[in-house]
Amino acid sequence: MEIKDGFIAINKEKGFTSHDCVKQIRKLLGIKKVGHTGTLDPDVTGTLPIAIGSATRFIQYLPQGKTYIGQIQLGIRTKTDDMQGEILNKKDWPVLSHKQLDKYLNNFRGIIQQVPPIVSSVHVNGERAYKKAFKNEEFELKPKEVEIEELVLNKWDQINGILEIKVSCSSGTYIRSIARDLGGSLDSEGCLLKLKRISACGFHEKNSIKISDLSDNNDKNAPFIIPTISALDHISTLVLANQEEINFWQTGRIIKFDANNFVKSRSFDYKKPIKIIDPNKILLGIGFINEEKTILHPKLVLNAK
């Protein structure tokens, strides 16, 4: 069986880079066009959605939220803000009840300004920050706005200074920064001890598979491939009702918008992208409606003519 496109949720194991996973998927499935939805550090485990074939064009339209389970070690500051980096300072942590520690976490809930770790993929004057850090160059990273939708204190070990948190956040959030800044707010230090991503871009750990469990036989791999249209289930849907409209679409021409063709099972927001399908529920691409709500503009066209 030939696999042409779709998504596969990989349960990334420790030690692998995201690019390592992409290379292995290319080799196993025999497909050149493969990409991931966002980098996971080598020591971070968990959900890594990977796009195959034409699905790579739809990555930007996936849900952007991500959820992590992480352990933070108080009392230690490192160069990388996790336990892999050089230790820069050690400082005792205060005696805190679970409730008291949870109150400190309020500083990291909602929309916040966050400074990324210096060892990160953020660009600084055209170069990745981690490259500058490894060359011991001095530079400053600007804070950026991120949203912490949920931050739950699961466990608190006062004796060892280790807390476990569950974090649901926007794309671009660094859990290492939360660890570092929490330690600072406690007049101590902090770094990330362990991290696992349990969901990302609408894909969940429970539906993921380890690369080592995949086969070089695509008949066996096929059940793990998620159709692109299923990955876009959160997006409103518009049906092109006839062949003339489909021909217009596939040649990149605008189409008169007919609200009666809207699939009513999804709420409709004219400012957001819409997935376009034919009467047989075949995905045709992504479009937008103009402000007057009269014209459908093609944005991403599959099988363009």
Swiss-Prot record:
**By its UniProt entry, which CDD domains does this protein fall under?**
PseudoU_synth_EcTruB
Record field: catalytic activity: uridine(55) in tRNA = pseudouridine(55) in tRNA
UniProt key word Aminoacyl-tRNA synthetase: no
Q: GO MF terms on file?
A: RNA binding; tRNA pseudouridine(55) synthase activity
Q: Which UniProt keywords apply?
A: Isomerase, tRNA processing
**Superkingdom of the source species:** Bacteria
Indicate the enzyme's highest-level EC class: isomerase
This entry's Enzyme Commission designation comes to 5.4.99.25
Please, one GO biological process term? Answer: mRNA pseudouridine synthesis
Q: Where is the active site?
A: D41
- What is known about what this protein does? Responsible for synthesis of pseudouridine from uracil-55 in the psi GC loop of transfer RNAs.
Family note: Belongs to the pseudouridine synthase TruB family. Type 1 subfamily.
- This protein is called tRNA pseudouridine synthase B
Q: Which organism is it from?
A: Prochlorococcus marinus subsp. pastoris (strain CCMP1986 / NIES-2087 / MED4)
Gene giving rise to this polypeptide: truB
